[in-house]
Amino acid sequence: MAARKNKKEGSQMGTVEKSSNNDASVTDDIRGAEYYHGMVPRQDAEANLKREGDFLVRKTEQTPGKVVLALSVRVTDELCRHFMLNLDPTSNKFYFEATHQESTIPDLITWHMTTKTPVSAASGAKLRRPMERSPWLINHDSIVANKKLGEGAFGDVFVAELDQGGGKQEVAVKTMRAEATRDARLKFMKEARLMRKYQHKHVVKVIGVAIHEHPLMIVMEFCPNGSLLSHLKKNKVAAGEKLRFTTEAADGIAYLERSKCIHRDIAARNCLLSQKNELKISDFGMSDSTDEIKEEKLDKVPLKWLAPETMQDKIYTHKTDIWTFGVLVWEIYADGSEPYPGLTKVQTRAKIVVNDYRMKMPDGTPSQIADIVTGTCWQKNPEKRTTMDAIHKKIREFYDSKK
């Protein structure tokens, strides 16, 4: 992804010729088909198929490391069926049931559509309407990576150029490598699916996903001024700007609360700054659209940002996001310092859970903001934390009074 491939290379990107192991493989004729959706998960495929006879073709991991093509069909209002595309190693032709074979997958699909022959006699599934790819699904050839911003266990983040024919746009691209586990890929797609729903000026916007081949990519708006944490550490941030960051974060998190999103990882490191230095909530890798999340363990989570009930009972709710927002505000006024300075994670947990300890807000924090954090966000009883809407309203009123 480091540079745009030439035409010859581009036409071969992700192409695999017909294999000899009875699997239908991705070839250029199917990659160009309107109904080919790449590595869209089964859940997303079923959500896209609305009416009886709607269908699409997608890639799926049949067994670890073995990727095949599948046909997904809406059979009834309640039921979708999924069929493997098979390749006869003797005839080198494709089929669903061996009684009829075609030289190409598009020819096989067309035959079933025109003859109205069910994909299988047992299912009775007929192909009526091909489900076209959403504009949200972006071709890999439209993306040119420029600079790596960071890397993770299964992928990297790049600044890239997106060109879909309407002009070039600078974007951020989060990738998922081919060697990632199936669970990691499903979480990756879940993150993209969640972010796609959110449209707010203080939440990072997802433009689309590239999932026709590896690496899988989430394409997002680019925030050139980097993370809030880095900005706080590197610059002497004025009091007015700190208050604005606090207000913008509250606005974005209140929107997520209204959207039933539990973020679970609100922190200065996960807030990005736009060209105009506006704060945007990012990183939805731990998020979910629900009212409560119960975890089995808290091994790899940032403990110093957790609410007491999360530390004790491994529960996340919209109220735990409010607690974490309070820690974010502390970070803003502490110039990006780590919360609970001088304490280990174990000591932090003990002081909060056993001793009901609360940090003192940093010097320079307006008393109105300090009162909201210590008196509302950090209430031991989650119900006394009110709502992010109510908290944002109070902060906004104070911010407006200072203009």
What are these regions (language model features)?
Residues 257-273:
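Catalytic-loop of the protein kinase fold
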Residues 321:
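Conserved catalytic-loop aspartate of Hanks-type protein kinases
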Residues 188-193:
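Regulatory alphaC helix of protein kinase catalytic domains
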Residues 208-209:
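A short, aromatic-enriched beta-strand patch in the conserved N-lobe beta-sheet
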Residues 2-154, 178:
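Domain-scale recognition of modular recruitment/scaffold domains used in eukaryotic signaling
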Residues 156-178:
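Glycine-rich ATP phosphate-binding loop
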Residues 213-227, 231:
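Conserved short submotifs of the Hanks-type protein kinase catalytic core
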Residues 245-246:
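Activation segment signature within eukaryotic-like protein kinase domains
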